[in-house]
Amino acid sequence: MASTYSLRQRIALAIVPRLASVAICCLGVTLRYRDVCEPGATPGYDIPPPGVYAFWHRCLLAGAWHFRDYKLTILISRSFDGELIARTVERLGFIAIRGSSSRDGAPGLRNMQRAYLAGHYCAITADGPRGPSMVAKPGVAHLAQLVGAPVRTCYLHPHRAWELRSWDRFLIPKPFSRVTVAWTSPVTPDLPSVQAALDRSMALAQTGNNPQK
């Protein structure tokens, strides 16, 4: 794939992931994460792998630091921006599988299926790669159906953040901010259930209250 990139893009690919991963580490050590769970839910890292997880694209940065130690397998688009993201998160310990839940999605989902069967946590940005923002696409439900697993969702809410004017309203946590990580109980792998769970996780994270306490 690298041969299809322009000289400027190749230079960016050589530099940006290194700088971005260092920046994420410098920011990440200042953040304070706290889990909240709806009834019947458990934080994903307290459940042995494998598992299928969904979250919104706007949560990628906060998630890149928080989930760095779990060898999480994540589906990332084959676009140039996707290549930048893939190389960045791989430097943080993630396993990037190229593809999407739309164009070229079938090979990506098959490789995600193999990762699940090999015992990995598998995650998909449910509204990626191009939106609409916070509207779930069928990719994560299809993956869960392939492997016969439920879908678990989470939302990472920085209490102080910059919100970009991008399609996903991407969130950049401000240094030293708190980040609430909300988890929902597992749902059946169908699109309405996944959308509803993602909506619940966002609402729970933004209120910051744990209904189990």
Where are these regions (language model features)?
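Non-catalytic C-terminal accessory region of glycerolipid acyltransferases
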Residues: 2-29, 45, 68, 73, ...
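Short, composition-biased local secondary-structure segments
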Residues: 52-61, 82, 103-117
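Conserved H-X4-D acyltransferase segment
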Residues: 20, 24-78, 85
